[in-house]
Regions:
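Domain-level signal for soluble alpha/beta catalytic cores
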Residues: 1-152
Length: 152
């Protein structure tokens, strides 16, 4: 018996909903609760699309507000010292975009394609600590819809 799965699902939304709400957030025209709401709606919609298409192994932890490599840095606690005083979405987006006092992490092309990613900053002083909050929350979100996911 064959089984099927999707490695990951596009996150931006058919009408670029994620991009639009993030731009409003960065312009201080909305708060992060609106961003989270849009993200939750997109994840639900995308998981249900896959369920309706009879995908047997649906992924969770494939959604990102900005960048999967940045998500991995957060997951592993690989936070550069200049960001240590920040937390939650302020930490996340400052690592990606910088702010008045912190320079953003480097962004570079993925294998010479037009896709860019945030380059992790790892040194001998990096203290790795697991932060599985996002992974567990997304798994539980899908479970509430009756979808038991494989975790990316």
């Amino acid at each position: 018996m064959q089984k099927n799965y999707v490695i990951g699902f596009p996150r931006i939304g058919e009408k670029r909903e994620l991009k639009k709400v993030l731009e409003k957030y960065w312009a201080k025209q909305t708060d992060f609760n609106e961003v989270k709401y849009v993200a939750e709606q997109l994840k639900k919609r995308h998981w249900n699309y896959q369920k309706e298409a009879k995908i047997e192994f649906i992924s969770s932890n494939d959604f990102s507000y900005y960048d999967n490599m940045l998500d991995t840095s957060i997951l592993l606690g690989a936070i550069p010292k200049r960001f240590e005083s920040l937390k939650d979405e302020e930490l996340y987006f400052t690592m990606a975009r910088g702010n008045e006092t912190c320079v953003a992490m480097e962004m570079t092309k993925w294998f010479n394609t037009n896709y860019h990613y945030i380059v992790p900053e790892i040194s001998k002083d990096t203290k790795f600590t697991l932060n599985s909050k996002k992974v567990i929350e997304e798994y539980k979100e899908a479970l509430e819809l009756g979808i038991k996911t494989k975790i990316n």
